[in-house]
Amino acid sequence: MSDQQLAEAQEVARLTGRVAALEEQLSRMEAMLATRLDRIATRQEEIGSFLIKRANRIAEAQTLYLGDHTAMTFLETGHRIYVDTRSRDIGIHLMAGGRWETKYTKLFRGLVKRGATVLDVGANHGFYAIHAATLVGATGRVEAFEPNPRLAGLATASLRTNGFRWARLHQVAVGDAMGQAELTFNPAMSGGGSIRKPGGPAKEEVAAVEVVALDQLFPEESFTVDVIKMDVEGYEGRALRGMEAILRRSPDVKILMEFSPALLARGGVDAAAVAGFLQDLGFQPWSVDEDSRPQPARWETLTAKGAKTHNILVARSL
């Protein structure tokens, strides 16, 4: 082979190697580009799905007036809820944004697990009962209690329309013994109804209601509870005494409740006595901070003279 032929062969080999290197580089670039395009496509699908969900939420987040002071609206979870349009406290918040007591709701949802048993004592429109039913699922159980016949009817309809067969609404008040009482209430302030003995004067509407003690309603030793939400405008002390056996056999139960010395006194119960009752059962209180986190509280502070109303978490341990 002549020097010229050798030089040409070497040049061909060099160019061939260069072409092979370029082909390999292009192949890597093509693979990288394909990966990036796949990521972009996936991201576009995620964004599209998000926008569709948001659009559906906006489309559904309308309040439909049904007549007779009744509307159907949607919680922020997308679940339907029936509302008394006269309610200027709870009802108006539900119709405006599907939310109520946001930091308290966040804590409540964090406590309720799939398959749990939840009691909603003072269910009102059924807001917490709906949240509970969503979270416990078909393997769980929700027992809700609301003596106001109007609100009980709305809450029952809400649970039914969402298909929560494992959730039940009892149109009764919860106390320390079986019996009868009167519920006084103002439709404009649906969260403020209170129980009293029959026969007294009233400036508000009055309804005769049945009172039940939960220990008598659920006497089975196998019946235990995981979470209790309770807001009964000062009747909490009596309601707790009526479920003492349930509390004793539910070691891990968490209770979210309103604690108001003034309202408890109006219901004929001393706040310190309620605190003592819970302490004797091993319960300690926690307050709820702005980030929905429980912070240790003291019974002495909660029951002190002039103490305000607090939404608290009561448990044996967290």
Regions found by a protein language model. Give the residues of each.
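Phosphate/nucleotide-binding beta-alpha loop and adjacent structural elements of enzyme active sites
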Residues: 2-318
